[in-house]
Amino acid sequence: MAGRSDMDPPAAFSGFPALPAVAPSGPPPSPLAGAEPGREPEEAAAGRGEAAPTPAPGPGRRRRRPLQRGKPPYSYIALIAMALAHAPGRRLTLAAIYRFITERFAFYRDSPRKWQNSIRHNLTLNDCFVKVPREPGNPGKGNYWTLDPAAADMFDNGSFLRRRKRFKRAELPAHAAAAPGPPLPFPYAPYAPAPGPALLVPPPSAGPGPSPPARLFSVDSLVNLQPELAGLGAPEPPCCAAPDAAAAAFPPCAAAASPPLYSQVPDRLVLPATRPGPGPLPAEPLLALAGPAAALGPLSPGEAYLRQPGFASGLERYL
């Protein structure tokens, strides 16, 4: 056994056939154990100059809406304007607009009815569309819709694919001054006094003739005339004794239009007597105020009042 090598197999295993040597086949395995077959990592793709795959959008990013096949390239405003432009009277009801769109484009005919809500919202929220009420004698349901005349050039060169800008109806400012109109009637017009003379009765002319007395009524004059009137019976009062002078001083229309001066005064007005002094005082009768139609007569002793000697001018203390 001196010539055998230590690496030779023992004699007990010499009867088994020798195992064929396995040659290595294929490239070495990838260093990434979890890599999917047929897909290379991004680092290897970047090293070879290839574009990396697009990562999936995160939860905070918005996905782009997929393009629906067969959908017309017109906005809802363009669809409504197209329907109104093809109408005979340039106006249509909401149901007629739906019918035009479904007859012209098969996409809206087969798709759900959600697009009708968009048509309705665009009609009410855009100033380029104007609602026209239905006439009382025109039977039917719903109002008409038409295009604002100022929005006729809203699309470029009549093409419904491009719209210039959002149409905004011009409104008058609230502080704009209104044009002057005709004067308002009396209940709504501001109060302004009518121009006229300050005096209702014109002053007497400075012509020849008797001038009227300065005061037509004076207590002192009536008291002084009392002794004379006592023996004359029932003369007319001084205010009515000179009709010619009063007529010359005042026009007849003013005298006829004025009410009686003492129509509300009672027949007799008696002032209470003052406190008597230590000695007897002469009593002077007071002429009572009577109506214009009643005559002035003598007064009874009970209707007199006492004048104190300190007052020389009569009833100034009561005026």
From Swiss-Prot:
Q: Where in the cell is it found?
A: Nucleus
General function of this protein? Transcription factor that controls lens epithelial cell growth through regulation of proliferation, apoptosis and cell cycle. During lens development, controls the ratio of the lens fiber cells to the cells of the anterior lens epithelium by regulating the rate of proliferation and differentiation. Controls lens vesicle closure and subsequent separation of the lens vesicle from ectoderm. Controls the expression of DNAJB1 in a pathway that is crucial for the development of the anterior segment of the eye.
What is the taxonomic lineage of the source species?
A: Eukaryota, Metazoa, Chordata, Craniata, Vertebrata
Any one GO CC term of the record: nucleus
Q: What is its main location?
A: nucleus
Phenotype upon changing E103K: In CTRCT34; decreases DNAJB1 expression
Biological process terms from the Gene Ontology for this record are: anatomical structure morphogenesis; cell development; cell differentiation; ciliary body morphogenesis; cornea development in camera-type eye; epithelial cell proliferation; eye development; iris morphogenesis
What does the record give as the DNA-binding region?
Answer: 71-165
Q: Cite the entry's keywords alphabetically.
A: Aortic aneurysm, Cataract, Disease variant, DNA-binding, Nucleus, Peters anomaly, Transcription, Transcription regulation
The source's superkingdom equals: Eukaryota
Region: Disordered; residue ranges are: 1-69
Gene responsible for this protein: FOXE3
Q: Which GO terms describe its molecular function?
A: DNA binding; DNA-binding transcription factor activity; DNA-binding transcription factor activity, RNA polymerase II-specific; RNA polymerase II cis-regulatory region sequence-specific DNA binding; sequence-specific DNA binding
Report what the protein is called. Forkhead box protein E3
Record field: compositional bias (Low complexity): 44-53
Disease affiliated with this protein: Anterior segment dysgenesis 2: A form of anterior segment dysgenesis, a group of defects affecting anterior structures of the eye including cornea, iris, lens, trabecular meshwork, and Schlemm canal. Anterior segment dysgeneses result from abnormal migration or differentiation of the neural crest derived mesenchymal cells that give rise to components of the anterior chamber during eye development. Cataract 34, multiple types: An opacification of the crystalline lens of the eye that frequently results in visual impairment or blindness. Opacities vary in morphology, are often confined to a portion of the lens, and may be static or progressive. In general, the more posteriorly located and dense an opacity, the greater the impact on visual function.
